[in-house]
């Protein structure tokens, strides 16, 4: 099984919140915490579907069933690879793939940074998704918005 865990995820930039408020035509700041929550959720969901980092983050892939290759996501750079006992494992990273010497259990820790071009391309989808969340849209609507990321 392979599992992706969030270790740390940065908050959206204040400019993203302002862009979202403009997109959603929010007239005041009374709902700011709710809007920020919707924006944070939307950014994380869109970055995972698009496989492009929108928020800086630190992640861990735990893999015990792999063929000696583990994928990292969203343009991640590997920080460490350890075995089940926390000992370092040698690896080579090429793009989004981490090549290992064995298929034993590993934990691959990596960091992500937003790419400005991807951020600009995906921000409209984020705003649309966050607005749909804020408006209480159903899963079918939310999923149709995410299709724009592919």
Task: Label each PLM-derived region with a short phrase.
Residues 1-150:
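Divalent metal-cofactor coordination and adjacent catalytic microenvironments
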């Amino acid at each position: 099984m392979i599992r992706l865990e969030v270790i740390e995820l940065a908050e959206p930039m204040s400019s993203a919140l302002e862009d979202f408020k403009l997109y959603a035509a929010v007239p005041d700041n009374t709902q700011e915490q709710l809007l920020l929550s919707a924006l944070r959720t939307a950014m994380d969901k869109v970055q995972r579907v698009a496989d492009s980092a929108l928020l800086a983050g630190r992640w861990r892939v735990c893999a015990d069933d792999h063929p000696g290759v583990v994928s990292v996501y969203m343009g991640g750079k590997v920080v460490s690879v350890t075995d089940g006992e926390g000992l370092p494992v040698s690896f080579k990273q090429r793009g989004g793939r981490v090549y290992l010497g064995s298929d034993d259990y590993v934990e691959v820790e990596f960091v992500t940074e937003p790419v400005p071009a991807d951020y600009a391309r995906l921000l409209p989808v984020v705003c649309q998704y966050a607005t749909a969340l804020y408006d209480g849209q159903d899963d079918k609507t939310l999923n149709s918005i995410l299709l724009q990321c592919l």
